[in-house]
């Protein structure tokens, strides 16, 4: 087991070293950002597939009745994080968003499958790359990869390298 503190060693650096041609990546997280894709673009181009589960209902048709909407919190923030979270504003202002979005969309069509947790059950975020497991992972963003600080006092991620551990998490996708 390894502890990644996202200061001295980042999840991004570890993923750059750990993702190889033919790797299979599975992610359960609250959001997906094109800027996180950009940080790992070279490595992600070589993978066989990415399976992603949004841990909260995202990009799904709402079925809530009008009476339940009295305390409704809009899901727009989860879905808009696709184009960057509040901590990725600096990158967004480089006017490269359209190009990154097109590259990411093309990659998603070729390599990725996205699903959403539509149950009322909580899901913990995690990521597996072949036999390595990273947990907890909140979102697939530059903050979670350790590229940006965000508003976290700390963001420690545990990495385990065991077929049994990774297989347990991978089975959650089936």
Task: Show which residues each predicted segment covers.
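PLD/PLD-like phosphodiesterase catalytic module centered on the HKD motif
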Residues: 1-174
